[in-house]
């Protein structure tokens, strides 16, 4: 069976990917989420429960809070880099940390494929793809939501 790591948040897009890739496409799906400080323990447990309901073979949560702070957040605070003069401009950098952690995990389990649920809109897809291609050019990227141009309703159905 083809081993695939799925960047998994537990939302609609990544839940669709888990079902589609495991049941329809026959991948051995290993779901992984990266906590950079946005999840509580109970939320991580919910994400894990949902991942298994969606048919994944394994689920792993990577705690990257300390890495995110030491490599990103503290510099945003030091530089007073704010979005709309309100909060640290951290989301784009957060995706980079998440992508690095996910691809390193994929390499550690010898995955042949990696997938994410980003749509064709926005920059998250670029951040994930760029890091994945740079750090593991031999691992094939699969993006069902973007490639199949699915609507939210199609994902639910």
Spans of features found by a protein language model:
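ATP-dependent adenylation/nucleotidyltransferase module used to activate substrates
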Residues: 1-156
């Amino acid at each position: 069976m083809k081993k695939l790591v799925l960047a998994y948040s537990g939302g609609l897009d990544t839940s669709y990917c888990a079902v589609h890739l495991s049941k329809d496409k026959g991948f051995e799906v290993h779901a992984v989420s990266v906590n950079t400080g946005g999840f509580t323990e109970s939320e991580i447990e919910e994400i894990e429960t949902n991942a298994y309901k969606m048919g994944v073979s394994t689920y792993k949560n990577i705690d990257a809070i300390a890495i995110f702070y030491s490599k990103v957040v503290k510099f945003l605070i030091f530089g007073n880099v704010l979005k709309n003069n309100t909060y640290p401009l951290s989301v784009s950098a957060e995706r980079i940390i998440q992508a690095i952690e996910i691809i390193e995990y994929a390499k550690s389990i010898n995955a042949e494929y990696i997938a994410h649920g980003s749509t064709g809109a926005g920059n998250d897809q670029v951040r994930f793809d760029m890091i994945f291609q740079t750090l593991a050019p031999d691992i094939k990227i699969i993006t069902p939501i973007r490639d199949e141009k699915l609507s939210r309703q199609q994902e639910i159905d």
